[in-house]
């Protein structure tokens, strides 16, 4: 079995400047942090040649073309695997404004790369996730979610026309503990999809 976990995120400042229409003309910058809530992807080989996908629904298909989940289908086009049992586990519900779709994408690509025996390069992983969501699926979203999900930690991310730069922000442990004590995440019960905006 191979697995990969990818964090959700909280964005502090700069959201929207990671959109292509903005950073290609100016430059985008965000301060964002990964949180200790995750998307987990676990992959097992099994005897059947079918693909068994277990997320909020279950799919059993004999061809990648028959996959209904749009993100999984697009990602699997890049791999020649068959006979896999792929399990998706999320600590929090999707559409909560915490970058869950990008965390899902990063986690699946990371798990598949590990299953192939490849070492994970964080920048390549983030770029691959951006290519899937933004270029292939044409989702009108930015790049910060994929990059913070791949890199983790507290980061200052700079978006330029042809490149992305990720700088880790180092803060004393004491200050991080005090900050964590002063914030709360509350489930409002209101969910939305970023691709509808």
Feature-to-residue mapping (PLM):
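ATP-dependent small-molecule kinase catalytic core of the GHMP/sugar-kinase superfamily
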Residues: 2-4, 9-28, 42, 50-51, ...
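Anion-binding (especially nucleotide phosphate/pyrophosphate-binding) glycine-rich loop
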Residues: 3, 35-132
């Amino acid at each position: 079995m191979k697995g990969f976990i990818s964090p959700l995120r909280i964005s502090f400042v700069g959201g929207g400047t990671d959109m292509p229409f903005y950073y290609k003309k100016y430059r985008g910058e965000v301060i964002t942090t990964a949180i200790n809530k995750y998307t987990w992807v676990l992959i097992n080989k099994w005897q059947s040649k079918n693909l068994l996908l277990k997320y909020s629904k279950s799919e059993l298909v004999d061809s990648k073309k028959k996959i209904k989940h749009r993100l999984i289908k697009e990602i699997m086009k890049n791999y020649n695997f068959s006979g896999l049992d792929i399990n998706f586990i999320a600590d929090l519900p999707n559409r909560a404004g915490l970058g869950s779709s990008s965390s899902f994408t990063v986690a699946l690509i990371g798990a598949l790369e590990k299953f192939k025996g490849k070492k994970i390069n964080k920048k390549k992983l983030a770029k691959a996730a951006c290519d899937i969501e933004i270029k292939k699926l044409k989702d009108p979203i930015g790049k910060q979610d994929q990059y913070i999900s791949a890199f983790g930690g507290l980061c200052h991310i700079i978006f330029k026309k042809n490149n992305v730069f990720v700088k880790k922000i180092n803060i004393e442990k004491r200050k991080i503990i005090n900050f964590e004590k002063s914030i709360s995440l509350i489930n409002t019960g209101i969910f939305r999809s970023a691709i509808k905006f």
